[in-house]
UniProtKB/Swiss-Prot annotation:
It comes from Novosphingobium aromaticivorans (strain ATCC 700278 / DSM 12444 / CCUG 56034 / CIP 105152 / NBRC 16084 / F199). InterPro entries: PurM-like_C_dom, PurM-like_C_sf, PurM-like_N, PurM-like_N_sf, PurM_cligase. GO terms for biological process: 'de novo' IMP biosynthetic process; adenine biosynthetic process. It catalyses: 2-formamido-N(1)-(5-O-phospho-beta-D-ribosyl)acetamidine + ATP = 5-amino-1-(5-phospho-beta-D-ribosyl)imidazole + ADP + phosphate + H(+). This is Phosphoribosylformylglycinamidine cyclo-ligase.
Length: 368
């Protein structure tokens, strides 16, 4: 036996399944995408150990920082299974920045985490391009992130996403819910679709009912069902920020996991209760389809999905009509959906017979 045959195997990171060269190439490729999100306070250059942000250059005098992080849930699996990687990054940004704006904070910078078993640069670039698009829609800079190639952690072709965003609000201008009062009007801003919550139920229905996602939707023969389901989460930052700063909004609730019932109470002080009338807006064809396919009760709809409303505003009744008109002029679809009343902290959603396919008038309540 030769010395060469006796030589022990030489291990490397590449043999373990990690391609450092591919990771470096990805950083170089996505650099211009990050650069395109530059804004006052950040130049959005990638490659360092961290990203800098200059609050003074962003125009703040005595700011409070507000931080949030989130993911996209199993909507990512839809993107993977149907090669729809280009917009899932918008969802990632939306889930974070919409959570900041409800506290009165302007999103300033964003960092992403992309984890996979084997790095596919083509897919990763498409995902990051969507993240950059989301950052531009929100007015925040993509200043860094992490790409983790972890063999054995994910099935072939799978990946997961997480986002982290920091915003700022001048001291004393933050929204905490303490300005909400009895009699306040609740305005609802339309969602763009399912957004990023409830997809475990959506995917279960798709599997059990044998949906053909690459074919026209049963309720719309001009658009594929997958296009409805993968529609990115709406980003409300630019339309809401001017009215927050002018003091015209008392509270905001981002309608995510827990639906209308569980998210609105998060911004209410004790002793106040939100009443929402489901008759005040028309159920979308997509939501009606999901409900019918799953024989889902109205209460479960109100606790699982946004039901067509992605953001709820509490506003002074004297200003409600004017603010609704101004938001419509800013591009939002606005509904007057309810009121604030005295009562135990919580939310009640009501509907008449046939609303959300109910056989009789119904009411669903969450306390807490």
């Amino acid at each position: 036996m030769s010395d060469e045959q006796n030589k022990p195997e030489s291990y490397s990171y590449a043999k373990a399944g990690v391609n450092i060269a591919a990771g470096n190439a990805l950083v170089k490729a996505i650099g211009p995408l990050a650069k395109s999100t530059a804004r006052p306070g950040a130049d959005a250059e990638l490659g360092g150990f961290g990203g800098f942000f200059d609050l003074k250059a962003a125009g703040y005098n005595d700011p409070l920082l507000v931080a949030g992080n989130d993911g996209v849930g199993t909507k990512v699996k839809l993107a993977i299974d149907h090669d729809r990687h280009d917009q899932i990054g918008i969802d990632l940004v939306a889930m974070c920045v919409n959570d900041l704006i409800v506290q009165g904070a302007e999103p300033l910078f964003f960092l992403d985490y992309f984890a996979t078993g084997r790095l596919d640069n083509g897919v990763a670039e498409r995902v990051v391009a969507g993240i950059a698009d989301g950052c531009k829609l929100a007015g925040c800079a993509l200043i860094g992130g992490e790409t983790a190639e972890m063999p054995g952690m994910y099935a072939d072709g799978d990946y997961d996403l997480a986002g982290f965003c920091v915003g700022a609000v001048e001291r004393g201008e933050q929204l905490t819910g303490d300005r909400v009062a009895e009699g306040d009007v609740l305005l609802g801003l339309a969602s763009s679709g399912v957004h990023s919550n409830g997809y475990s139920l959506v995917r279960r229905l798709a599997a059990d009912k044998g949906w053909k996602l690459d074919r026209p939707a049963l309720f719309d023969n001009e658009r594929l069902l997958i296009d409805y389901l993968i529609e990115p989460t709406r980003i409300y930052v630019k339309s809401l920020l001017p009215f927050i700063r002018s003091g015209r909004i008392n509270a905001l609730a981002h309608i995510t996991g827990g639906g209308l019932l569980e998210n609105v109470p998060r911004v209410l002080p004790r002793g106040l209760h939100a009443r929402i009338d489901a008759d005040s807006w028309e159920q979308s064809r997509l939501m009606a389809f999901l409900q019918a396919q799953g024989n889902i009760e109205p209460e479960e709809m109100a606790r699982t999905f946004n039901c067509g409303i992605g953001m709820i505003l509490a506003v002074n009744p004297a200003q409600a009509d004017a603010l609704a008109a101004d938001l419509a002029a800013a591009g939002e679809t606005v509904y007057r959906v309810g009121t604030i009343v005295k009562g135990e902290k919580g939310c009640t959603v009501t509907g008449s017979a046939e609303t959300w396919s109910a056989r009789s008038a119904w009411e669903a309540t969450h306390i807490g």
